[in-house]
């Protein structure tokens, strides 16, 4: 995958998608289209299309952002120390496009490993199960059998 140029990204992404993925912005809580959204499918990086999260691992954390217990594949995301805003957090970025996705916290469901991947909806695109094969994500159909 070759990451699109800054100019290409500005032409294809909304202002919010660009600010979140390229400038590490955070969308307002409870404003993203996937916060209260529970259809079966996968969530991919809005920039590169790389698979990130499954709806099977999504839950309502009540925080205002889509929350997941884990990524589809651990190697699909990278974590980075974030000391911005006077806090110490762990930032989550996509592996290939290096898009800012959100942060991971240790206050998730204990029975699922205790992690909460708090992700900006603006960094994601949802691919429903019915479209996985057609859009090139057929290998993930087995998650939903």
Swiss-Prot record:
It comes from Enterococcus faecalis (strain TX4000 / JH2-2). Induction: By cadmium, lead, mercury, copper and manganese. Pfam families: SelR. InterPro entries: Met_Sox_Rdtase_MsrB, Met_Sox_Rdtase_MsrB_dom, Mss4-like_sf. The keyword Coiled coil does not apply. Belongs to the MsrB Met sulfoxide reductase family. Keywords: Oxidoreductase, Stress response. Residues 6-129 form the MsrB domain. The active site is at 118 (nucleophile). PANTHER family: METHIONINE SULFOXIDE REDUCTASE, PEPTIDE METHIONINE SULFOXIDE REDUCTASE MSRA_MSRB. One of its GO terms (biological process) is response to oxidative stress. PROSITE patterns: MSRB. Coiled coil: none annotated. This is Peptide methionine sulfoxide reductase MsrB. One of its GO terms (cellular component) is cytoplasm. GO terms for molecular function: peptide-methionine (R)-S-oxide reductase activity. Its EC number is 1.8.4.12. It catalyses: L-methionyl-[protein] + [thioredoxin]-disulfide + H2O = L-methionyl-(R)-S-oxide-[protein] + [thioredoxin]-dithiol.
């Amino acid at each position: 995958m070759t990451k699109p140029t800054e100019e290409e990204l500005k032409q294809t992404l909304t202002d919010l998608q660009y600010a979140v993925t390229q400038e590490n912005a955070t969308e307002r809580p409870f404003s993203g289209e996937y916060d209260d959204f529970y259809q079966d499918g996968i969530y991919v990086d809005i920039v590169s299309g790389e698979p990130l999260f499954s709806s099977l691992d999504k839950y309502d954390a009540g925080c205002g952002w889509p929350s997941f217990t884990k990524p589809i594949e651990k190697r699909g995301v990278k974590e980075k120390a974030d000391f911005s805003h006077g806090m110490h957090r762990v930032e989550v970025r996509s592996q290939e496009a290096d898009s800012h996705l959100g942060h991971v916290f240790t206050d998730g469901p204990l029975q699922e490993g205790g992690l909460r991947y708090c992700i900006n909806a603006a960094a994601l695109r949802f691919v429903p199960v019915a479209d996985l094969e057609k859009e090139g994500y057929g290998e993930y159909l087995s998650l939903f059998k």
